[in-house]
């Protein structure tokens, strides 16, 4: 019985010692914490290149937007002109869809209804 108790104490001591060694070794590996802000030379260079590309394509985007706006305005004006031409009291007025103008049937000239 005395021998079994000694074995248990010995085993417990060995387990405790190995646990201490294990935890101290894992603690030693993480005794420093390095936090990077992500602000490295490479990320700054990439951000600079992206900004440059964005600025280079800005004028192109503006041109596309202006053209789309002009086309929209043109279609809007033509729709209003067609509506006014068809509502006109002038019986000789007709809408020419190819030229988007209100014309006189007799003369073929553009009229303002």
Curated annotation (Swiss-Prot):
Record keywords: Signal
The keyword Lyase belongs to this UniProt entry's keyword annotation? no
Task: Output compositional bias ranges, type Basic and acidic residues.
Answer: 49-59
Q: Name one Pfam family in it.
A: DUF1283
- For bias type Polar residues, the affected ranges are 39-48
Q: Where is the secretion signal located?
A: 1-28
Q: Which residues, by range, are in coiled-coil regions?
A: none
Region feature Disordered, mapped onto this chain: 38-60
Report the superkingdom from the record.
Answer: Bacteria
Q: Which family does it belong to?
A: Belongs to the UPF0482 family.
In its UniProt entry, what is this protein called? UPF0482 protein KPN78578_15540
What is the species of this protein? Klebsiella pneumoniae subsp. pneumoniae (strain ATCC 700721 / MGH 78578)
């Amino acid at each position: 019985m005395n021998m079994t108790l000694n074995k248990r104490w010995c085993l417990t001591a060995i387990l405790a010692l190995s646990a201490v060694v294990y935890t101290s070794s894992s603690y030693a590996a993480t005794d420093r914490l390095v936090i990077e802000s992500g602000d490295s030379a490479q990320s700054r260079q990439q951000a600079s290149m992206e900004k440059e590309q964005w600025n280079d394509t800005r004028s192109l985007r503006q041109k596309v937007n202006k053209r789309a706006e002009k086309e929209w305005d043109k279609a809007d004006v033509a729709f209003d002109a067609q509506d006014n031409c068809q509502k006109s009291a002038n019986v000789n007025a007709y809408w020419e869809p190819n030229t988007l103008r209100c014309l006189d049937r007799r003369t073929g000239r553009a009229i303002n209804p």
